[in-house]
């Protein structure tokens, strides 16, 4: 029987500071052979359709910080399966709302530097 570590709602770059290490420790402790992220690896607070925190980082700073953290997750779990959550797809929804075709949007792996995801 497979041992699957399911990781949800990371919300980078604002995840709990110890969340990644906690997940790494769980994977090692239980000898997991598969890791699945079940959505919302990213937060994208700066481009939310909801009211945003005025003192929060802007979209470029948020993306730069998220990229560093997402690559760390990818280093920890290089063969993970990543599903797209509603926060992850905010860029696609925002682009569609102003008629930007999907082919102009970079792939997940290309954007975040997560080869294999």
Give the ranges of each region predicted by the language model:
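Core catalytic region of metal-dependent phosphoesterases/phosphodiesterases
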Residues: 2-3, 7-116
């Amino acid at each position: 029987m497979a041992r699957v570590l399911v990781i949800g709602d990371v919300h980078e770059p604002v995840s709990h500071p110890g969340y990644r290490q906690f997940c790494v420790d769980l994977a090692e402790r239980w000898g997991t052979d598969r890791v699945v992220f079940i959505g919302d690896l990213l937060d994208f607070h700066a481009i939310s359709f909801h009211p945003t925190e005025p003192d929060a980082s802007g979209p470029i700073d948020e993306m730069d910080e998220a990229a560093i953290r997402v690559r760390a997750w990818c280093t920890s779990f290089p063969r993970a399966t990543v599903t797209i959550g509603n926060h992850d797809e905010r860029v696609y929804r925002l682009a569609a709302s102003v008629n930007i075709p999907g082919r102009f949007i970079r792939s997940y792996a290309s954007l975040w530097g997560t080869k294999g995801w």
